[in-house]
């Protein structure tokens, strides 16, 4: 039986179509995925992300532990509340999960990990934390609501008290602050400004209803996927998994190679991959009629006349742009155009950077 978040009843009251998402009953949409998508791009929408896992890490060696566990380097985190995005890799350089880590104090950090990878993540973290004496607390007592869009922060702030409004005033992206009952972070998965707000389970339903009253539109998994794809954001198990290097998933920027003497899990394998080369993640745009779908083959001929084939990892119709877009993992050497096989048709596509929309506008 699939689990329910504390907001399940609110979803049904809002008319959601519920689906099983990695063992959780979650809203796919509330009537119109397209309307929900546009609400986030032009105004404010919200998502129940309570199925994601918040993990608090405490102990005097927590920073040392995370510098070993993660490919990105938490030594960069020196201001309380600052966050960074990182892959958590296995010894062969594959991605166990991608996550966000927050720094609060030298002996207190917080991770937010994906729902689909929860059990293996917790097992991996626990296994490697033991020698460092880390206390691990899984925060199943918290729900999380993502409020996203150009008006999201202003509308969410109408629910905050004076101290909470003061706490978030001027807060830059990728920061989080505990303000009363609310943990408020300037993070998201849409390419828009907004907050991800964690709060006690028993207060989540009232907060959700108050956001609806404030004019924030409930949004489901369908819009979440088209929004993140337009923003060029990876989805675990599609753009990367335990067999795929972050170098082949447009995550090279999340690997902290310096200092060279920092030993993190997967480093040796990554260095070999960097030397020998890997596939890469690119964007594809198809303005002709049709939709680019996951797992369709992508073919191209390189400058030397050699033929190559890659694969679409995520594809959809872009509601913001009005045509089809995709992320694709392809061999090195791809040029500005390629061919995608859609049934019995060979469709020309333009090859772009793996990002299509930022802050509601097309990325040139």
Curated annotation (Swiss-Prot):
List the SUPFAM superfamilies hit by this protein, alphabetically: Aminomethyltransferase beta-barrel domain, Folate-binding domain
Looking at the UniProt record for this protein, which Gene Ontology cellular component terms does it annotate, in alphabetical order?
cytosol; glycine cleavage complex
Q: What is its EC number?
A: 2.1.2.10
InterPro entries cross-referenced by the UniProt entry: GCS_T, GCS_T_bac, GCST_C, GCV_T_N, GcvT/YgfZ/DmdA, GcvT/YgfZ_C, TrmE/GcvT_dom1
Molecular function terms in GO for this entry?
A: aminomethyltransferase activity; transaminase activity
What keywords tag this UniProt record?
Aminotransferase, Transferase
Q: Name one GO biological process term.
A: glycine decarboxylation via glycine cleavage system
A Pfam family it matches:
GCV_T
Q: Give the catalysed reaction(s), semicolon-separated.
A: N(6)-[(R)-S(8)-aminomethyldihydrolipoyl]-L-lysyl-[protein] + (6S)-5,6,7,8-tetrahydrofolate = N(6)-[(R)-dihydrolipoyl]-L-lysyl-[protein] + (6R)-5,10-methylene-5,6,7,8-tetrahydrofolate + NH4(+)
Database matches in NCBIfam families: gcvT, PRK00389.1
Question: What is the annotated role of this protein in its UniProt record?
Answer: The glycine cleavage system catalyzes the degradation of glycine.
Q: Assembly and partners?
A: The glycine cleavage system is composed of four proteins: P, T, L and H.
Hey, which family's this protein in? Belongs to the GcvT family.
Q: What is this protein called?
A: Aminomethyltransferase
What organism is recorded for this protein? Escherichia coli O45:K1 (strain S88 / ExPEC)
From the UniProt record, report the name of the gene that encodes this protein.
gcvT
């Amino acid at each position: 039986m699939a689990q329910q978040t504390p907001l399940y009843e609110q979803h049904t009251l809002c008319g959601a179509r519920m689906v099983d998402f990695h063992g959780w009953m979650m809203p796919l949409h509330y009537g119109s995925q397209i309307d929900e998508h546009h609400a986030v791009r032009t105004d404010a929408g919200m998502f129940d992300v309570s199925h994601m896992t918040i993990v608090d890490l405490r102990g005097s060696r927590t920073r040392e532990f995370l510098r070993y566990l993660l490919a990105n380097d938490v030594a960069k985190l020196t201001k309380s509340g600052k966050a960074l995005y990182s892959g958590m890799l296995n010894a062969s350089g594959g991605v166990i999960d991608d996550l966000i880590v927050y720094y609060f104090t030298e002996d207190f950090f917080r991770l937010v990990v994906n729902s689909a990878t929860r059990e293996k993540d917790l097992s991996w973290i626990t296994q490697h934390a033991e020698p460092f004496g880390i206390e691990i607390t899984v925060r199943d007592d918290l729900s999380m609501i993502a409020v996203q869009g150009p008006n999201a922060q202003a509308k969410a702030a109408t629910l905050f008290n004076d101290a909470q409004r003061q706490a978030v005033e001027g807060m830059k992206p990728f920061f989080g602050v505990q303000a009363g009952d609310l943990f408020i972070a300037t993070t998201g998965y849409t390419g828009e400004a907004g907050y991800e707000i964690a709060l006690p389970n028993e207060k989540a339903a009232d907060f959700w209803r108050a956001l609806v009253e404030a004019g924030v539109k409930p949004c489901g998994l369908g819009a979440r996927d088209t929004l993140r794809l337009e923003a060029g954001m990876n989805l675990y198990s599609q753009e990367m998994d335990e067999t795929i290097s972050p170098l082949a998933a447009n995550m090279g920027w999340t690997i902290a190679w310096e200092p060279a003497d920092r030993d993190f899990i997967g480093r040796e394998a990554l260095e070999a991959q960097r030397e020998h080369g890997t596939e890469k993640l690119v964007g594809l745009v198809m303005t002709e009629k049709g939709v680019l779908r996951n797992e369709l083959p992508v073919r191209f001929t390189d400058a030397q006349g050699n033929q190559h084939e890659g694969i679409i990892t995520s594809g959809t119709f872009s509601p913001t742009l009005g045509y089809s877009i995709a992320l694709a993992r392809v061999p090195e050497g791809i040029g500005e155009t390629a061919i995608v096989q859609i049934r019995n048709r060979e469709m020309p596509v333009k090859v772009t950077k793996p990002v299509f929309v930022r802050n509601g506008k097309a990325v040139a």
